[in-house]
C-alpha cells in the first residue's frame, strides 16, 4: 500500500471529550471517527487492525473445531419473552416495533437465537456435541457510553455456543476453549491473564475471564507469581488469618469522636492504625414473600466490601444498601457512628468478615452521634458474629492456593467463557433423545471475545507519548518505508520502490510513504499509527549502500546494509 493511495488523516490533538488513552490515540491516528455517542466509523486504517484481530480469532476457532455461522442482528421479541430475559433486561436492550407492530430487539447477545436454531434441527445425541460461533456487530444501549470502543453502544464480538449431551462433555469443550483463547491472545501478541470469575447475570457454573494487562484497566486481578493462581478480585477468596485472636487487654469505653465519621478520620483522631477500626455497612434484604432483613456487614477499616461475596449470604440475598431513614429507625443514629454493640438482635443481623472475627480491642460506632466504642471484644462485649468472606483481597494477602502472596494487577476484560449448563436450554425447551430414547435437556457453553474491544485494550497496553505501539500481528502495517526526497531524488525513489516490491513479494504487509511531506511529518504519522518497523531511505545513506532501520520501541535507529535489510526485517517479523 502507498500512502498516496490510502485514505487516512491524523490529528495533532485529541478531541477534548476523549477520556482514555486508546480513545485519544485512535481518534488522533485516524483509526475511528465518532458518529454518535458510543458509535464509531472504523476508518480504513483502524479496520485493517480490526480485521487482523478478527482473522486470528476466526482461524483459532476453526482450528478448535467450531463452525461459523451468522445470526441476525434483529431478533424477535418472542424468543426473549420465552427465555424470560425480555423482562429481566433493562433499557440497554434496544426494542422497537416494525410496521406491523411486531416487537423486535437489536441483539446485545444471541443465546436465545442460537438455542432456537439448535432446538429446531438437533434431535438426537448422535448430533451432539456441536459448537457454533459468529463474529458480528452487537448493540447495547449503554446509559453512558465511554472510553471509545472500550465501552461503546455498538461493538464487534465473537460469540460461540456449544451444545452437549452431558456435563462431562461440556467441561471437555470448556477446557478446549480455555486453551483456544489462550492461543488467540498469545498470537495477538498481548500480555494477558486468564482468571477465575463470577458468572454474573448470565448464569451457569464455571467461568473464566481473559484480561489484557494495562495500568488503565477497569478490573482488579488477584495474581500469585509463585503459583500462577489468578482470579478476578470479585471472586478471589480472602483467607482467614492464621494467628489466633489475641486476648482482650482493655475495657470497652465510649469515646467522644466529634464529627469523625469516616474510618480514616476516626483512626487519625484516636491515633490508631486503620486496621484497628471496624466499619459497619448497613444493608436491607427484601424477600419475595415480603419479609425484610436489616443487617450490619462488618469489615476492617482498611478493607472494602465485596458485594458479590456478600450477596451469597442466604439471609440477605438479594440485598441493597439501607437508606438513612432505615438506619435511624433501627439503630437510632445516622450512618457514620453505627456499630454492632448493644443492638437488638431481633431487628438487626450481624455478619462479620473473617478478618474482623479475628480482631480484639477494636473500635466501632457507638450508635450515638459523635461517639465510638473503643476496646471492643467479641464474646465479652457483644456476641460472636456469623463469619463470612465478604471483602476484596488486597496485595500481600495469602494466595488461596497456599503457595505465596497475592499481587493486584489491573486488567481489561476482552474474553469470557461460561459453563451455562441448562439455563437457556431448559427455558427454551432445547432437548434431545438419548441412547435409550428418553428426552434430555442439553448442556450449553458460551464463549465470548470482544473483537473491537481488543483493539482498544491493545492500545491501552501499548502506547507512549508518540502514539500507538501494536504487536506486528495486529498493526495496520508491519513495515513502513519512509523515503527522504521521494519526489526529488531518482535514486531514493528507485530504492524505495524496489524495497517495497521485494517486501510485498515475500508477503510482508508494507506501506510506502510516498507523500510529498516533510520528514518530520512522515515520522510522526508512522509512529502515531503504530507501525512496528520503519526503514528510512536517504541519499546520504545510499552513497554508502545503507538504509536506516528503527523499530517502534527502539530509542535510536541503526544503519543496515541495503543488501541485508530484507533479511533483517524477515527475522524481526518471524521472531515477533
Curated annotation (Swiss-Prot):
Pfam families: HGTP_anticodon, tRNA-synt_2b, tRNA_edit. The keyword Cell cycle does not apply. Keywords: Aminoacyl-tRNA synthetase, ATP-binding, Cytoplasm, Ligase, Nucleotide-binding, Protein biosynthesis. Its EC number is 6.1.1.15. GO terms for biological process: prolyl-tRNA aminoacylation. InterPro entries: aa-tRNA-synt_IIb (IPR002314), aa-tRNA-synth_II (IPR006195), aa-tRNA-synth_II/BPL/LPL (IPR045864), Anticodon-bd (IPR004154), Anticodon-bd_dom_sf (IPR036621), Pro-tRNA-ligase_IIa (IPR002316), Pro-tRNA-synth_IIa_bac-type (IPR004500), Pro-tRNA-Synthase_IIa_type1 (IPR023717). One of its GO terms (cellular component) is cytosol. It is found in: Cytoplasm. The keyword Protein transport does not apply. Consists of three domains: the N-terminal catalytic domain, the editing domain and the C-terminal anticodon-binding domain. Homodimer. This is Proline--tRNA ligase. It comes from Dechloromonas aromatica (strain RCB). The lineage of its organism: Bacteria, Pseudomonadati, Pseudomonadota, Betaproteobacteria, Rhodocyclales. The gene is proS.
